[in-house]
Amino acid sequence: MNSKHSSDFVVIKAVEDGVNVIGLTRGTDTKFHHSEKLDKGEVIIAQFTEHTSAIKVRGNALIQTAYGEMNSEKK
């Protein structure tokens, strides 16, 4: 694995039930490759890898990265 990707972690904490965390693949065709559903208070630590180029968060969650902290919102 490329060491460039190994330190790119994202912490996602659900603020309410039903937060979806979706991993998207690299390459010419972007596809879903993993999905998790979090309930209020649950935390997932995700990592960018040679296969994961993006992480989509759907729902109300606190997202922390090395670059800062943000909140996702419900529609």
From Swiss-Prot:
Which SUPFAM superfamilies did the record assign? TRAP-like
Q: Which GO terms describe its molecular function?
A: RNA binding
Give the record's keywords alphabetically. Answer: RNA-binding, Transcription, Transcription regulation
Q: Pfam families, from UniProt?
A: TrpBP
Q: How does it assemble?
A: Oligomer of 11 identical subunits arranged in doughnut-like structure.
Q: Which family does it belong to?
A: Belongs to the MtrB family.
Name by which UniProt lists this protein: Transcription attenuation protein MtrB
Q: What is the lineage of its organism?
A: Bacteria, Bacillati, Bacillota, Bacilli, Bacillales
Gene3D superfamilies given for it? TRAP-like
Q: Which GO terms describe its biological process?
A: DNA-templated transcription termination; regulation of DNA-templated transcription
General function of this protein: Required for transcription attenuation control in the Trp operon. This trans-acting factor seems to recognize a 10 bases nucleotide sequence in the Trp leader transcript causing transcription termination. Binds the leader RNA only in presence of L-tryptophan.
